[in-house]
Amino acid sequence: MIVEERMRTFINSLDAGNTPFLDELECSALSEGVPIIRKEMQSFIKTLLALKKPQRILEVGTAVGFSTLLMCEYSQPEMHITTIENYEKRIPKARENFRRAGCESQITFLEGDAGQILKELSGAYDLIFMDAAKGQYIHFLPEVLRLLK
């Protein structure tokens, strides 16, 4: 998300911050060069979750699980996330982060190519968050639209 500096400052001023676990995970990911969502996107997602109160969320692109856990933390307790990751080096780290956060029961973690997995999913999702290979979004779109409630 590209945002002008004044708008970024305003958006970030409205956010009370994250939990210590998420702050630690964010610092760790950034120090290891793992791309995670920026502060203003974190604020936007928290606002969207508060307004929409989704029960079923689909995330395409898990990385180390930062945004997955952010959505777990700031969603309704009965919410469930299905998240997809293809990069083998990040899968164990994401699993470990889900375990450390105590959110495993809220998360279905699917490993593999999102293009194929999306075709196999059924049911409707209240919210779909895409944070994967940007060049593939156009190919994911038909399946994402089919799955979006």
Per-range role (PLM):
Residues 1-127, 134-149:
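A short alpha-helical cap/connector motif
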